[in-house]
Regions:
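C-terminal and inter-domain tail/linker signature
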Residues: 1-178
Length: 178
């Protein structure tokens, strides 16, 4: 049972005391969202992946309710033990198109970290997504300075160099209205 909850932080060291404090609070908050049920770990009904996003980048309250319900149902119905949760702090240096498991970059727009949940059966799950990805053994990282072109189907078509992350937000919003 000692290995049931293994929390790991990967990436850069906190830049200052304020960032260190926020990371500590975040990990405590994440742990509180996992509650053991009959020797298994399930997400509390109050769990909302949007809470993992910085406040100024968080979607409006109520946004993505359907995706949230699918996400929680998918995880809780798996009835597997959560063996670890790895928090990878997002840094410049890795491309949106290099995400493990073919993840949709739209799931991570605005996030400052990626949380990887590892279950007994092996899938990796991204917060805010109802998709389950098979493990690849790679860390999930994202480069906020490497914008990509995403078509109306959410597929990466090519990279746009020199565009701001705000422009990527705008492009995704345009695609959502098509």
């Amino acid at each position: 049972m000692a290995d049931e909850y293994a929390w790991t932080i990967r990436g850069s060291q906190p830049r200052n005391e304020e960032e260190r404090r926020k990371r500590k609070i975040f990990l405590g908050y994440l742990e509180a969202l996992l509650e053991p049920v009959d020797m298994k770990s399930r997400f509390a009904t109050s769990f909302w992946p949007h809470d993992l996003l910085p406040g100024d980048q968080r979607p409006p309250e109520g946004a993505g309710i359907e995706a949230m319900e699918q996400f929680r149902e998918r995880i809780n119905s798996a009835c597997t033990t959560v063996r670890s949760a790895t928090v990878t702090w997002i840094e410049d240096g890795a491309a949106l198109s290099m995400l493990a498991g073919g993840a949709d970059p739209r799931d991570l727009v605005g996030a400052s970290m990626v949380v990887t949940y590892v279950h007994d059966r092996g899938p990796l799950v991204l917060p805010g997504s109802d998709r389950v990805y098979e493990p690849t053994g790679k860390d999930l990282v994202l480069n906020v300075s490497d914008a990509v072109r995403i078509d109306s189907d959410g597929m990466i078509t090519d990279r746009w160099s020199g565009l701001s992350f705000a422009h990527l937000h705008w492009q995704l919003e345009q695609n959502a209205t098509l």
